[in-house]
C-alpha cells in the first residue's frame, strides 16, 4: 500500500470532497494541482507539467500557477465549463508547528462567477435549480449571483419546457439531484452547453427563509432551497445581496421556444453566434450595463398585458417628444456604474476604493436624471422619476471619506481623505514631518562632510540609510557613521539620529495604513446597509435606460407607434425587417404590406428562391415582438394583435443535435406549433415538407394547412414551392395566396422583393442555380427535365372530400441525359431564349460569327 507524504495525504482528503472540480491547492506563492488534475490542467491551460516527490516510487504529476495571477487561469477553466475549488492555507506557517491547515474557501463554477473579468457586462450569468415533483411538474428557480436576482416558477414536467426556460435565460449551470440528472436526456446533458451540478439538499437555509413567500408551491420552495443551499455550501460567505424570490408565470409573457428565438435571431445570430445582426443588437442603445441586461430580458419575454404594453409605449412617446431632455438623460446615464453587480461585490467583500468612487459618482447622477424626467411634464415619466432613490446619506459619506485618486489596492493607504479621522491625520503628520526631517538631514550631512553626492535613501530590508560613494568614504568623520551595507561602488551607513527618526516614521506609516484599512472596511460595511436600496435604484435606472433606447432607435430608424387591435386583426402598411433594413440601408430595402384578420387567417406565399419570402415572414414576427416589448415598429402604419405565442420553422439551419433528420426536425417543430398554438398565436412555416419525397411533402403540407385552418385558427404565414397548393384558396375561405414578384429581363431573373396578391406563376429555381454558378451542362440538363415535367403537368391537389381532381401520372426520369422530343415550338422557344441571353456588346466579330454558325447548326 502506498504511503503518501502528509502534504499529499492532506491534498487527497480535500480533493475527495471536490471530485468534479480542479483543486487549486495553496503552497506558498503558488496554487498547485496534482495527479489527474495536473495532467488535465497542464493541457487546458498550456502550462508546464512537472513532478513532485510524494511517497511513491515515481514522482506525482504536478503543475501550478502563481497565486497573484491565478484569476486568469481560473477564468479560462470556467469559460470551458469546469469548476475550480480554491484551497487556502488558513493558518500562519510561521506560527504553526507541523502541517499547515488548509480548507476550500470557495468553489467557483460557471454559474457562480463574481470576478468582473469572467462576466460580460450586458449579459446575466444565471445558475438554475430543478425539483421534480411526482413526475408531474418542475419547481424551477434561478439566480444571477453577481446581481442578487432570484426568481422562481412552476413548469410542466416536460423536457421541451425545461429547455425553453434554460435557453431563454442562457443558463450556465443547472443544479439537480442524482435521480433527476439520470432521467434527463443526453441532448440536455451534452448539447446545451450547461454545467450540471448534483446536489441533494433542498431545504431552505434558516438565514434565507425570509427570501421565500408563503404562497409558493412545495416544488417551487424545494427548487429555491436546493439553489440557496448549494450557493451557501460552495460560496462559504454571506449572501446578503440575494433579493427576495420573485414568482413569475410563463403565461404572463409571449411564449417562443428555443427554435423560434433562434430562427428569428432575437439575441444570437444563427451563423456568428454573436449579437451582431440580431434584434437585440438593433434595439440596444442602452448606456448602462444593467440597462443592457434588462433589455435582453424584455426581448426574451415580450409582454401580453395590454396595459403594460401601452404604458411602455406612452413612455417612449414622451421621450421621443422631448429630444433635448433625452440627450441630457443619455449623458447622465453614461456616468452611472453597474449598481447591481457593485452591490454583489459589496456583499462578497470584494469591493475596492475605486468601486466606491464610481458608486459615489453614479449617485451624483440620480438627482439630475430625476430632474430631467420631471421637466418633461409627463405623468408616466414622473412616476418613474419618483422611484429614483438618490441615497443622499450614503453619497455624503462617500464624498466625506474616499479620496478621488484612491488606488485599487486597499492595504497600501491613499484611500481616506484628510480630515475624516483625527487619529489618521496625526499619523500622517508624523510621517510627513519625518520625511521633511529626512530631507533636511540630507542637506545638513552634505554641508557637514562636503560630500555633494551623499544621499539619504530607503528600502524595506535596511530601512533608511545614508549612501556615500566609495571614493568619498574617507571624508566621513570617524565614530558617527555605522556601516550597514557594502555595494560595488558605494557604502551605506546609519547614524543614531537617523535610526531614531526612522522608527517614528515607520511606526506612523504602519499605523496609518492599518487605521486607513480599518476605516475603509467601516465605510464598506456601511454600504452593505444600502444594498437593497441600491438594487431597487438599479432596477429603476435600467428601466429608464431601456425606454430611452427604444425612443432613440425608433426615432433614428423612423419607427411608428403601433395600435393594438381588439379583434385580433393585423394590418401593417409598408413594413420593414428592422435588422435587414439597418444592414442594407433604408434606400435599398423594399417595404411590404401584411394583412391578416379573422376572415384571412392564412397567407400562402409563393415565389422564387432568394426572392425574400423568409425575410418577409421574419419581418412580420419581429414587428409583433417590437410592439409587445413596448417599442415602436418599422412601418408607415401598424395595427397589431397581442400574440400569446410565436412558432417558426424558417431557414435551413437545422439543429440536428439529437441525431434527427432534417425532415424529423421539421415534423417535430410542426407538431409543437399545431399542438400548442391558439387562435391568438402566430405561426411561420417556411417550406414545410421539403425534407421528404415530393408527394409526401406536398400531402403533409396541404394537411397541415387544412388542420390549422379548420382547428387552430392561428395567424399563419406559410411559404411553399408546391405551386399546386395555391389551388387551396378555392377550398379554404380563410386562406389567401400572395407571392413575391420577379421578372425576367434578357433571360435573367430580377427579384423585385415586392409582395403581391395571388400565386406566383414561376419558381425561377434554375435561374437561381445559374446565379450560384453551377456547371453550364448541369443547368442545361435541368432545363430539359423541367420542360419534360411541365409538358406532363397535372394537378394533384386533393379536395377535402378526399376525391382527386386529377392524379399526376408517374414520370420515370432517365438517369442519363436524353435528347428532348423534337417539338418545333419547344426548339424555337429555346433558341429565342438563347439569343435573348447573348451579350452582343461584349462579343468580338469572330465570336458573333461563331455563335451564328452554332445557332444555324442547331436549326439543321
Swiss-Prot record:
PROSITE patterns from the UniProt entry: DNA_MISMATCH_REPAIR_2 (PS00486)
Keyword check for ATP-binding: yes
Binding site for ATP: 607-614
GO molecular function terms noted in the UniProt entry: ATP binding; ATP-dependent DNA damage sensor activity; damaged DNA binding; mismatched DNA binding
GO biological process: mismatch repair
Family statement drawn from the similarity comment of this UniProt entry: Belongs to the DNA mismatch repair MutS family.
Entry function: This protein is involved in the repair of mismatches in DNA. It is possible that it carries out the mismatch recognition step. This protein has a weak ATPase activity.
Protein name stated in the entry: DNA mismatch repair protein MutS
UniProt organism field: Listeria monocytogenes serotype 4a (strain HCC23)
Amino acid at each position: 500500500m502506498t504511503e503518501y507524504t502528509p502534504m499529499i495525504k492532506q491534498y487527497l482528503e480535500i480533493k475527495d470532497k471536490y471530485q468534479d472540480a480542479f483543486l487549486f491547492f495553496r503552497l506558498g506563492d503558488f496554487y498547485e494541482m496534482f495527479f489527474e488534475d495536473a495532467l488535465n490542467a497542464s493541457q487546458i491551460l498550456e502550462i508546464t507539467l512537472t513532478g513532485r516527490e510524494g511517497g511513491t516510487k515515481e514522482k506525482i504529476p504536478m503543475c501550478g500557477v502563481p497565486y497573484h495571477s491565478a484569476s486568469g487561469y481560473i477564468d479560462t477553466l470556467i469559460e470551458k465549463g469546469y469548476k475550480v475549488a480554491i484551497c487556502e492555507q488558513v493558518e500562519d506557517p510561521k506560527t504553526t508547528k507541523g502541517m499547515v491547515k488548509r480548507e476550500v474557501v470557495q468553489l467557483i463554477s460557471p454559474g457562480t462567477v463574481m470576478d468582473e473579468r469572467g462576466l460580460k457586462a450586458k449579459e446575466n450569468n444565471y445558475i438554475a435549480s430543478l425539483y421534480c415533483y411526482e413526475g408531474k411538474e418542475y419547481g424551477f428557480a434561478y439566480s444571477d449571483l453577481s446581481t442578487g436576482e432570484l426568481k422562481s416558477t412552476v413548469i410542466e414536467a416536460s423536457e421541451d419546457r425545461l429547455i425553453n426556460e434554460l435557453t431563454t435565460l442562457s443558463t450556465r449551470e443547472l443544479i439537480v439531484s442524482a435521480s433527476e440528472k439520470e432521467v434527463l436526456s443526453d441532448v440536455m446533458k451534452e448539447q446545451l452547453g450547461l454545467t450540471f451540478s448534483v446536489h441533494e439538499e433542498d431545504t431552505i437555509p434558516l438565514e434565507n427563509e425570509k427570501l421565500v413567500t408563503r404562497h409558493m408551491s412545495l416544488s417551487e420552495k424545494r427548487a429555491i432551497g436546493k439553489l440557496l443551499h448549494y450557493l451557501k455550501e460552495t460560496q462559504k460567505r454571506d449572501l446578503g445581496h440575494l433579493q427576495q424570490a420573485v414568482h413569475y408565470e410563463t403565461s404572463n409573457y409571449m411564449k417562443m421556444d428555443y427554435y423560434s428565438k433562434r430562427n428569428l435571431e432575437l439575441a444570437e445570430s444563427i451563423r456568428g453566434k454573436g449579437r451582431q445582426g440580431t434584434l437585440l443588437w438593433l434595439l440596444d442603445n442602452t448606456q448602462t450595463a444593467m440597462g443592457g441586461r434588462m433589455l435582453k430580458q424584455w426581448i426574451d419575454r415580450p409582454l401580453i398585458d395590454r396595459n403594460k404594453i401601452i404604458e411602455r409605449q406612452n413612455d417612449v412617446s414622451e421621450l421621443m417628444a422631448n429630444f433635448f431632455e433625452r440627450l441630457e438623460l443619455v449623458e447622465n446615464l453614461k456616468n452611472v456604474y453597474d449598481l447591481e453587480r457593485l452591490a454583489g461585490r459589496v456583499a462578497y467583500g470584494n469591493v475596492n476604493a475605486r468601486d466606491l468612487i464610481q458608486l459615489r459618482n453614479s449617485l451624483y447622477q440620480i438627482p439630475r436624471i430625476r430632474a430631467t424626467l420631471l421637466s418633461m411634464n409627463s405623468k408616466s415619466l414622473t412616476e418613474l422619476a419618483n422611484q429614483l432613490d438618490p441615497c443622499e446619506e450614503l453619497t455624503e459619506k462617500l464624498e466625506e471619506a474616499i479620496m478621488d485618486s484612491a488606488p485599487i489596492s486597499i492595504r497600501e493607504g491613499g484611500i481616506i481623505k484628510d480630515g475624516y479621522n483625527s487619529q489618521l491625520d496625526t499619523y500622517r503628520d508624523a510621517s510627513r514631518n519625518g520625511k521633511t526631517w529626512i530631507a533636511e538631514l540630507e542637506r545638513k550631512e552634505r554641508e557637514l562632510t562636503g560630500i555633494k553626492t551623499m544621499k539619504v535613501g530607503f528600502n524595506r530590508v535596511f530601512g533608511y540609510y545614508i549612501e556615500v560613494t566609495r571614493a568619498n568614504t574617507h571624508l566621513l568623520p570617524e565614530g558617527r557613521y555605522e556601516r550597514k551595507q557594502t555595494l560595488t561602488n558605494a557604502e551605506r551607513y546609519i547614524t543614531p539620529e537617523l535610526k531614531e527618526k526612522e522608527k517614528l516614521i515607520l511606526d506612523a506609516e504602519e499605523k496609518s495604513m492599518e487605521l486607513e484599512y480599518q476605516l475603509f472596511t467601516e465605510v464598506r460595511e456601511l454600504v452593505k446597509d444600502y444594498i437593497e436600496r441600491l438594487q431597487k435604484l438599479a432596477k429603476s435606472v435600467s428601466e429608464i435606460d431601456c425606454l430611452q433606447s427604444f425612443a432613440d432607435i425608433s426615432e433614428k430608424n423612423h419607427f411608428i407607434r403601433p395600435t393594438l387591435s381588439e379583434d385580433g386583426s393585423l394590418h401593417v402598411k409598408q413594413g420593414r425587417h428592422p435588422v435587414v433594413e439597418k444592414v442594407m440601408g433604408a434606400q435599398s430595402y423594399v417595404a411590404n404590406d401584411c394583412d391578416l384578420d379573422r376572415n384571412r387567417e392564412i397567407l400562402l406565399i409563393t415565389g422564387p428562391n432568394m426572392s425574400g419570402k423568409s425575410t418577409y415572414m421574419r419581418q412580420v414576427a419581429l414587428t409583433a415582438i417590437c410592439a409587445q416589448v413596448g417599442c415602436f415598429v418599422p412601418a408607415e402604419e401598424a395595427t397589431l394583435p397581442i400574440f400569446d405565442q410565436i412558432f417558426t420553422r424558417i431557414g435551413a439551419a437545422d439543429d440536428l443535435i439529437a441525431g434527427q433528420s432534417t425532415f424529423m426536425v421539421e415534423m417535430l417543430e410542426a407538431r409543437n406549433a399545431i399542438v400548442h398554438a391558439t387562435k391568438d398565436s402566430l405561426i411561420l412555416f417556411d417550406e414545410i415538407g421539403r425534407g421528404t419525397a415530393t408527394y409526401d411533402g406536398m400531402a403533409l403540407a396541404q394537411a397541415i394547412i387544412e388542420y390549422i385552418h379548420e382547428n387552430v385558427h392561428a395567424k399563419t404565414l406559410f411559404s411553399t414551392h408546391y405551386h399546386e397548393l395555391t389551388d387551396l384558396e378555392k377550398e379554404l375561405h380563410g386562406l389567401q395566396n400572395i407571392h413575391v414578384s420577379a421578372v425576367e429581363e434578357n433571360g435573367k431573373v430580377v427579384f423585385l422583393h415586392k409582395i403581391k396578391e395571388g400565386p406566383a406563376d414561376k419558381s425561377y429555381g434554375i435561374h437561381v442555380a445559374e446565379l450560384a454558378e453551377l456547371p453550364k451542362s448541369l443547368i442545361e440538363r435541368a432545363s430539359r427535365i423541367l420542360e419534360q415535367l411541365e409538358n406532363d403537368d397535372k394537378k394533384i391537389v386533393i379536395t377535402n372530400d378526399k376525391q382527386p381532381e386529377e392524379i399526376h401520372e408517374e414520370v420515370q426520369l432517365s438517369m442519363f441525359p436524353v435528347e428532348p422530343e423534337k417539338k418545333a415550338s419547344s426548339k424555337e422557344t429555346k433558341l429565342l431564349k438563347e439569343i435573348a441571353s447573348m451579350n452582343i456588346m461584349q462579343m468580338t466579330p469572330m465570336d458573333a460569327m461563331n455563335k451564328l454558325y452554332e445557332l444555324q447548326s442547331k436549326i439543321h
